[in-house]
Amino acid sequence: METIRTKYLGGLRTEAEHVKSGQKVITDAPLDNQGKGEAFSPSDLMTASLSSCMLTIMGIAARTHDIPFENISCKVTKIMVANPRRVGEIVVEFDM
């Protein structure tokens, strides 16, 4: 069974649904790529997924080794490049 079901809503927007929970996320193309920039862009979600995965893995390791792991966050900077348009760099800074 699929994990995520995504549908195109038109106007460069999509809706991704986590099938098991029913939680939904809307994406919108950014202003600099013909969108309205009213929601996460697909590449924003990619970088958010990376940082969420990193913090989750750190949390699992901390729990496994009885290390306090609270009030931890990170800032993510996504740097786009052209020709072809793509994510060129992702910078993750942890606040611990």
What do these predicted ranges mean?
Residues 1-48, 59-96:
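Extended beta-strand/beta-hairpin segments
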Residues 53-54:
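Alpha-helical metal-binding/catalytic segments enriched in His/Glu/Asp
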